[in-house]
């Protein structure tokens, strides 16, 4: 299961905060330009005696510097907005296991992990709380479903509890194949695409 399905609702919520930050940045940009125009006008008058050409050059220089400063500020605010949104995503990722839909997400992550290692005799690693969510009857149903899909005998044995936020880690019995579908690993793997999606949605 991709990070997009896990985080789309969170990105939507974070969008509200991002729009506020961007509005403030744009207001600050306008303030910088307005101040620069006023400064340029004052300096233009002060050096009018030196000639219109010098005055115009000074005005253009001040405005160019102001535009550069405003652009830099806007880029900084853009990156700040993306970072704040990512932090919000990470905060909500920690809360995801508490939500009603989490069990379905966990089951899909397990199925995806089993697919990626090819089935067979496997070790299932979860955090302590999730081992209570995936009881023996659920595990048996998963094994049966994967056998039907893969046309291969698949056995999921519970391993040790891991210190992960949620999700799962699937290993083959001989340890040669590992699928890390923990929530944090899934998020990290898709970080670049998540950043791109945030930028696309917000800007």
Curated annotation (Swiss-Prot):
InterPro entries: ATPase_E_C (IPR038495), ATPase_V1_Esu (IPR002842). One of its GO terms (molecular function) is ATP binding. GO terms for cellular component: plasma membrane; proton-transporting two-sector ATPase complex, catalytic domain. Component of the A-type ATP synthase that produces ATP from ADP in the presence of a proton gradient across the membrane. The keyword Oxidoreductase does not apply. Its main location: membrane. SUPFAM superfamilies: V-type ATPase subunit E-like. Keywords: ATP synthesis, Cell membrane, Hydrogen ion transport, Ion transport, Membrane, Transport. GO terms for biological process: proton motive force-driven plasma membrane ATP synthesis. Belongs to the V-ATPase E subunit family. Pfam families: vATP-synt_E. This is A-type ATP synthase subunit E. It is found in: Cell membrane. It comes from the Archaea. It is a peripheral membrane protein. Has multiple subunits with at least A(3), B(3), C, D, E, F, H, I and proteolipid K(x). The keyword Coiled coil does not apply.
